[in-house]
C-alpha cells in the first residue's frame, strides 16, 4: 500500500465500510487524480503535485461530510453513460437501469415516450439513445433538475424534449398519444427516513425522495389518472416502486382500469418495477 491509499483509508475508515473504502481509494486515485492503476496495485509510492494534494484533501473533506462521491465527481454512471449530477437531482441507481432495460427489451418499436419526474434525465436520455426511432418527452417540476437534464441531453447528443410541468396541475397537459409513460417518482415515506444513510438524507433532494406517510401512492395515482388521457389504447405504464407497496400498487392500478398488471423484482429480490397496459 502506498502513502496515498494509506492516507485515504486512514481518513475514511471510521465512516465507511472496509470494502467501500477500498473502492473509494481506487476511484479517487485513478479516476479523480489520474494515478495509474498498475502503480496502485504494485504498491509503487506516488508523489502528488501540490495542486493534486490540495484536490485530494478537498475530496477527503467532502467525503467525511458524507457527501456522495458522485456529487464530488460531478457525474454518475448509468446505462453505460456518464450523467452530470448535483444535489438538485437524485443519483441514478442500478435498479432504475433495470427499468430502462425492461422498457427497451419489451418495446423496441415504441415511438412516443414520456418520462415524468425526469431529474437528471437519465431515464429519458437512455431511452432516447437505445430507441433511436422514438420521440421522448420528459417533465419535472424542478428548474434546477431540468437545467442539469438539458445539459446531459446536450453532452450525450440526445434529442429529448424537456418541460417544466407539475403533474398535479392540468395547465399545459394535452392529450398527446404516448406509447409509454415511465416514472420513478418520490416513494420513500417519512417513517422510512430513519432507515436511510446520511449521504442520502443530507445531500439528495427531498423533493425527489419523500412522500407523506398518509398517502404514499399520491404520485402514482395521479400519473395513472394522466395515463388514461395520455396513453394510446394498448399503451403501457412503467413505474419504479417502493418495495413495501407492491400489492397496494396493483390494486390501485387495476382500479384505474389498467390490465395485465405485473410487479417485477429487482436484482436484490425486492418488488421494484410495476408495468400495466392501458
UniProtKB/Swiss-Prot annotation:
Keywords: Methyltransferase, S-adenosyl-L-methionine, Transferase. The keyword Repeat does not apply. GO terms for molecular function: nucleic acid binding; protein-(glutamine-N5) methyltransferase activity; protein-glutamine N-methyltransferase activity. Substrate binds at residues 184-187. It catalyses: L-glutaminyl-[peptide chain release factor] + S-adenosyl-L-methionine = N(5)-methyl-L-glutaminyl-[peptide chain release factor] + S-adenosyl-L-homocysteine + H(+). InterPro entries: DNA_methylase_N6_adenine_CS, HemK-like, N5-glutamine_MTase, PrmC_N, RF_methyltr_PrmC, SAM-dependent_MTases_sf, Small_mtfrase_dom. S-adenosyl-L-methionine binds at residues 117-121, 140, 184. Its EC number is 2.1.1.297. The keyword Lipid metabolism does not apply. GO terms for biological process: methylation; translational termination. Belongs to the protein N5-glutamine methyltransferase family. PrmC subfamily. HAMAP family: RF_methyltr_PrmC. NCBIfam families: hemK_fam, RF_mod_PrmC. Methylates the class 1 translation termination release factors RF1/PrfA and RF2/PrfB on the glutamine residue of the universally conserved GGQ motif. This is Release factor glutamine methyltransferase. The lineage of its organism: Bacteria, Pseudomonadati, Bacteroidota, Bacteroidia, Bacteroidales.
Amino acid at each position: 500500500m502506498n502513502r496515498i491509499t494509506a492516507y485515504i483509508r486512514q481518513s475514511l475508515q471510521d465512516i465507511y465500510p472496509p470494502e467501500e473504502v477500498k473502492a473509494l481509494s481506487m476511484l479517487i486515485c485513478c479516476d479523480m487524480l489520474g494515478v495509474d492503476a498498475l502503480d496502485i496495485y504494485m504498491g509503487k509510492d506516488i508523489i502528488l503535485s501540490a495542486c493534486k494534494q490540495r484536490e485530494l484533501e478537498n475530496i477527503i473533506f467532502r467525503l467525511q461530510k458524507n457527501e456522495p462521491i458522485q456529487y464530488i465527481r460531478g457525474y454518475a454512471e448509468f446505462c453505460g453513460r456518464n450523467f452530470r449530477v448535483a444535489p438538485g437531482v437524485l443519483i441514478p441507481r442500478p435498479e432504475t437501469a433495470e427499468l430502462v432495460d425492461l422498457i427497451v427489451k419489451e418495446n423496441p418499436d415504441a415511438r412516443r415516450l414520456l418520462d415524468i419526474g425526469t431529474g437528471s434525465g437519465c431515464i429519458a436520455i437512455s431511452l432516447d439513445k437505445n430507441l433511436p426511432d422514438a420521440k421522448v418527452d420528459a417533465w419535472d417540476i424542478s428548474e434546477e433538475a431540468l437545467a442539469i437534464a438539458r445539459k446531459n441531453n446536450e453532452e450525450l447528443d440526445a434529442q429529448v424534449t424537456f418541460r417544466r410541468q407539475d403533474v398535479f396541475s392540468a395547465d399545459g397537459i394535452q392529450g398527446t398519444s404516448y406509447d409509454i409513460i415511465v416514472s420513478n417518482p418520490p416513494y420513500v415515506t417519512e417513517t422510512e427516513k430513519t432507515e436511510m444513510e446520511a449521504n442520502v438524507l443530507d445531500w439528495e433532494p427531498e423533493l425527489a425522495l419523500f412522500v407523506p406517510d398518509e398517502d404514499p401512492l399520491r404520485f402514482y395515482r395521479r400519473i395513472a389518472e394522466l395515463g388514461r388521457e395520455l396513453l394510446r389504447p394498448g399503451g403501457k405504464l412503467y413505474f419504479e416502486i417502493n418495495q413495501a407497496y407492491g400489492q397496494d400498487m396493483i390494486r390501485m392500478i387495476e382500479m384505474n382500469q389498467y390490465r395485465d398488471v405485473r410487479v417485477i423484482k429487482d436484482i436484490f429480490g425486492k418488488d421494484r418495477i410495476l408495468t400495466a397496459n392501458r
